[in-house]
């Protein structure tokens, strides 16, 4: 016969665990909302910067631009900037981005290209340090949503390596946010930049809302079309000098948006994982409660039979 006390203790433990996972789910949901607000707050600057760069690129499209950040050279060494999380309990978020980085490194190695890593997030740092790969620098994720200051520190580091010639190309590997239950590791070339190839497309803002007591994501399409500078606009400085000054800002902005999107993906993955854990805990607690009731009923029935048997013996 099952041990009633053991079943009761296990049910209590599972219910306590469910309280923890539910609290973690709500915390992750609140942080996703803050991440959303942060992205929306930085959008005006990003849109204006894209407009200025787009206008300058259009103005200078027939000129030869001899700017360091635009110079493409033979790739002998590629820097892989990998963004992961600091903690676990977020499903396959960290595993997927690390696997994508390893896959890309193998592809480059097969082409005879050396790889050096710049790592963001403790999970990627711990993983690649154990494998003793060449690491240029490591950064912890901030406790809150990444800011422009955080992105600027990393951007300055990779920019210095690119300008010094120790890195010929920088590729960013991060997780693109698709929905609360879906994200995808992607690769984006950060350096060298190409203003002639600046694409300005419609963007989407992901808003975390609630409906029927459940969290869901609504999508809002934002027009990102830009207007060209007037043809008669006069620059006090040489447009090439202006472009040279704005390109580092554009690099930092690109990194910031990817970092914020990775952070939102991690939080959404954690929220989903904790939601699934809470559901599983409820289901397991229900199954154990049923088993407990059956065992208790069997024990009572056995006691009644023993009493009746004893009475008949008298």
Curated annotation (Swiss-Prot):
Q: Which SUPFAM superfamilies match?
A: ATP synthase (F1-ATPase), gamma subunit
Where primarily located? membrane
Q: Which GO terms describe its cellular component?
A: plasma membrane-derived thylakoid membrane; proton-transporting ATP synthase complex
Where is this gene product found?
Cellular thylakoid membrane
Give membrane topology per the record: Peripheral membrane protein
Q: Which UniProt keywords apply?
A: ATP synthesis, CF(1), Hydrogen ion transport, Ion transport, Membrane, Thylakoid, Transport
Does the entry feature the keyword Thylakoid, yes or no? yes
GO MF, any single term:
ATP binding
Please indicate if the UniProt record lists Coiled coil as a keyword. no
Checking InterPro entries in the record gives:
ATP_synth_F1_ATPase_gsu, ATP_synth_F1_gsu, ATP_synth_F1_gsu_CS
Quote the function comment for this protein: Produces ATP from ADP in the presence of a proton gradient across the membrane. The gamma chain is believed to be important in regulating ATPase activity and the flow of protons through the CF(0) complex.
Binding partners and assembly? F-type ATPases have 2 components, CF(1) - the catalytic core - and CF(0) - the membrane proton channel. CF(1) has five subunits: alpha(3), beta(3), gamma(1), delta(1), epsilon(1). CF(0) has three main subunits: a, b and c.
Q: Which family does it belong to?
A: Belongs to the ATPase gamma chain family.
Q: What is this protein called?
A: ATP synthase gamma chain
What is the species listed in this Swiss-Prot or TrEMBL entry? Trichodesmium erythraeum (strain IMS101)
Q: What is this organism's lineage?
A: Bacteria, Bacillati, Cyanobacteriota, Cyanophyceae, Oscillatoriophycideae
